[in-house]
Design a protein with these regions (language model features):
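Short, well-ordered coil/turn segments that N-cap beta-strands
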Residues: 14-19, 44-46, 90-95, 121-123, ...
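Glycine-rich loop at the start of a catalytic domain that most often binds anionic cofactors/ligands
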Residues: 32-40, 60-66
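Active-site-adjacent beta->alpha loops and helix N-cap segments on the catalytic face
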Residues: 1-11, 30, 55-62, 72-84, ...
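Generic structural signal for hydrophobic
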Residues: 40, 86, 115-116, 141
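N-terminal small/glycine-rich loop or linker at the start of catalytic domains
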Residues: 5-27, 61-66, 86-98
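Active-site mouth loops of central-metabolism enzymes
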Residues: 19-35, 70, 94-108, 149
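Conserved, mostly hydrophobic/aromatic
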Residues: 21, 40, 48-51, 116
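Hydrophobic alpha-helical segments and helix pairs
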Residues: 90-125
Length: 150
């Protein structure tokens, strides 16, 4: 039984869809993003997607937000620290990291799963994970209780 499953079951029992909100962490600044995430949860967001900024996102709608977050110096370690603080404030709200593969690869796959778990992240969306790399990334995440979607 995961936070994601409990969240979806609660929404199903309430006969409503889940309000899943995406935030590019670091836009306009890491501190402002963290405050925004807290306000979104307090206002009723059921689940938060923590968007990791990337210099060349495939989803062009988030390109400008990613550029601003990168200009603000946002890094994956900082995002994980923010996730950890959000987790302490909101222990039942699912947090899903939304990232591109290059960011994860540069961070280091060997430490990724354990660091996601330590930060209280509930899932990983790796939107551009190549099929040939899934055999390495998926077991790392699953071994740490982090479901991954590609």
């Amino acid at each position: 039984e995961t936070r994601i499953n409990r969240c979806l079951e609660r929404c199903r029992a309430e006969k409503r869809g889940a309000l899943v909100v995406y935030v590019t962490v670091g836009c306009p600044s890491p501190a402002e993003s963290e405050a925004l995430i807290g306000r979104l949860i307090e206002a009723g967001a059921d689940m938060i997607e923590l968007g990791v900024p990337f210099s060349d996102p495939m989803a062009d709608g988030i390109q400008r937000a990613g550029q601003l977050a990168l200009q603000a110096g946002t890094t994956l370690p900082e995002i994980l620290a923010i996730a950890g603080r959000i987790r302490k404030r909101f222990p039942e709200t699912p947090l899903v990291l939304f990232s591109y593969y290059n960011v994860l690869l540069n961070y280091g796959l060997d430490r990724l799963g354990a660091d996601l778990r330590s930060a209280g992240v509930d899932g990983l969306l790796a939107v551009d994970l190549p099929l040939e790399e899934r055999g390495e990334v998926v077991p790392i995440c699953e071994a740490n209780g982090i479901p991954i979607r590609c």
